Regions:
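A short, structured loop/turn motif at beta-sheet edges
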Residues: 30-33, 57-64, 88-94
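Intrinsic-disorder/low-complexity, polar/charged segments enriched in Ser/Thr/Lys/Arg/Asp/Glu/Gln
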Residues: 23, 34-36, 79-83, 111
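The feature marks short-to-medium sequence segments in extracytoplasmic or secretory-pathway proteins
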Residues: 50-75
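N-terminal signal peptide c-region/cleavage motif recognized by signal peptidases
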Residues: 13-15
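Short, solvent-exposed, Trp/other aromatic-anchored flexible loops in extracytoplasmic proteins
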Residues: 66-106
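Sec-dependent signal peptide recognition
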Residues: 1-8
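Short, surface-exposed binding/anchoring microloops in extracellular/periplasmic proteins
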Residues: 19-55
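Edge beta-strands of extracellular beta-sandwich domains
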Residues: 106-116
């Protein structure tokens, strides 16, 4: 009698139990044609059904400055680092935000702050 209720609860909370992508390290370096942003992510990729699928660079006001798509799972490469070059960061900003996502859970709720050295 209680088994259907328990099964329904487990199914309803399954995605909430999944681990979100975590920014392990990040830096932004100025260059001749914009900034290069390097982000190291950790995520328990399981394969094509659940993997870290990208990250975005945001201004403090939430405006998107860049997006790095991750096109395949990194099951055996954790954590892993990817770069995005040519990011135009407006003068006057002292930091940007990095927000990763995964194919199952979407965007993480709290982005990671990266201070800029100009």
């Amino acid at each position: 009698m209680h088994r259907p209720v328990l099964a329904a609860l487990l199914l309803a909370t399954g995605p909430a139990l999944a681990e979100a992508p975590v920014v392990v390290a990040a830096e932004a370096l100025p260059g001749g044609s914009g900034w290069t942003v390097s982000v190291t992510l950790r995520h328990p990729d399981t394969g094509w059904d659940h993997y870290a699928s990208g990250w975005e660079v945001l201004a403090p006001d939430g405006a998107r400055l860049g997006y790095r798509e991750l096109t395949h799972p990194h099951v055996d490469e954790q954590p892993f680092t990817r770069n995005l070059s040519g990011v135009e960061i407006p003068d006057g900003l002292d930091h940007v935000l990095i927000r990763p996502r995964c194919t199952l859970d979407g965007w993480v709720a709290a982005p990671t702050r990266v201070d800029l050295v100009r």
